[in-house]
């Protein structure tokens, strides 16, 4: 048996009693809120809504024994009030719509935006009046799945959308598009108005699941799609007309301006999500559709060095797929041709100065590197094109073709480096040297035969160290450091050991001098120094001739030989007289009381000291006393005669020196300088040295190729011919480009030596023989 209980009741509130006052207040708020609304009136309206919705609680009842949650469920009312407000708002929309019938374009937009702003502001106010209904009756209806029920402010937007916006949508959108087009045509527009109307499109994108958020469906379907189509049509027509009447450079400026305008347009009054689609549409119409015309202008702009236009072209074409690829190819060909022409212009006489050659290469590189890093923003594709072009014109050009050798570039680069690092009145300032050495490394990066550079460089470094002609050891160390960072430790290991030998030689010479003073208790009577250099580290050739050292120098050599053998009993000294030098003091001249100091090679010293005993000597007599071979003797006598230290009888010409040619000291010798350098290198010796280096390089390459083949096959065990060729080239191309025919010969050599064998049954396959 159940028992009913009653609760105290509240006064019943009828809708018809409260609605007239609610309607009057709502109308006042909707139409004239800007004049203010009394707080007491607001409280009264809120109380009406509260009383009406809460009145049903007094009618609720509970049964004894009912579950708690069931008993507490409130039967709030509100449907009639909700429907009454719904009808009121729809009637208001109908009145607003009627007032738009004669309006179009900006007047229509002005009216619409004014009413929208008034309406949304008012409905936020009214929403607060109906807050109690929102929290209880409306929430319950929504929770129960009623699709047609909304919170009051959302309801107001739904009614605006369905009753006013939808009928006006086409006229509104057309008006917006017309005004935006007029702005594109250069007219001033009210961007605040446009932004306000468009924001209304966005606000009407209601999200049922998340009422406080909007979706862009209304904005996209009602405005954005039509706007993008209008944009495409506008720029299709404009671009076709403009490019037919103006230059490509002017067209690119126009496109750049238009793209910037569209970005600004989004910022001023469009939704931010529109930007990506809008710009993509503009890029397709303004750039992609005219890309062939733009590509075709690139070569002309390169030739005329139109940097601003090239910068703009890169910026525009980088926006579209594959827009830059033809430019990269064109740039590569252009730079290669410019480089080849530049080298050809300085190679007309067949003789090229290293400084002129390297500066010419660098001038081309720097010009286009500045273009790539600046206008093309260090784009990796353009960097690669520049690298390919430089590699081609640096390794194969008029100079290398004339020399019939791609190794000419590394040789000239080594000579240019020697020019920088060797003492000279023309040496650059030390502050400039770091940049100049960096310039050397730029060209070094592109030369293919880095082993040729290494051989020439080490040869020249050896001469600078032996003859003491380096600008500074710090700069020498800097250059070696740069080579090491580029090519690794192995590339510079011998160069670094050369410096070690120089340091050890200085220490050894100090000990020798102490030994002479303290042990031998004698004086050498001459200023004697010696460098002890390890054979494996120095690129030095043994002398090509015998040489009978003058008796004046014999004591020095013998004492040092004895001292060194006592220090290092297991080592052997080989004297390199052809690299040695010294100074002689003249005491025979009638023209100078103080005399001259002659800086000579040891061979020249050997010849000149003969004249301490004899007034005149024939070539044959000099050869007998010095033991020099004909070619070396001729070069030595020629250099002394050309320096006018010796007089020849008969005078020398380009023919061979006869054995009977007589030589005597020129006692009338005069020179403005007191210290005279006569160790002039002979051109034939330089040529022989170059030939020797190239021969050494070729032999070294064969050994390196064989070593690479063995390494690869030891790891792979078995490999096809093509695969082996590819791996060998890959391993060695950082030092030089191995030629295919040389690799084949090296494979045959290794098969003969039984390091490799051909695989039976498999054509062109090799296996490693353990």
UniProtKB/Swiss-Prot annotation:
Pathway(s) of this molecule: Protein modification; protein ubiquitination
Disruption phenotype: Cells are defective in inducing cell-type-specific gene expression and exhibit defects during aggregation, including reduced chemotaxis.
Keywords (A to Z) from UniProt: Isopeptide bond, Ubl conjugation, Ubl conjugation pathway
SMART domains: CULLIN, Cullin_Nedd8
Annotated ranges, domain Cullin neddylation: 700-761
Primary role: Probable core component of cullin-based SCF-like E3 ubiquitin-protein ligase complexes which mediate the ubiquitination and subsequent proteasomal degradation of target proteins. The E3 ubiquitin-protein ligase activity of the complex is dependent on the neddylation of the cullin subunit. Required at several stages during development. CulA and fbxA regulate multicellular development by targeting regA for degradation via a pathway that requires erkB function, leading to an increase in cAMP and PKA activity.
Name listed for the protein in its UniProt record: Cullin-1
Organism (species): Dictyostelium discoideum
Lineage, opening ranks: Eukaryota, Amoebozoa, Evosea, Eumycetozoa, Dictyostelia
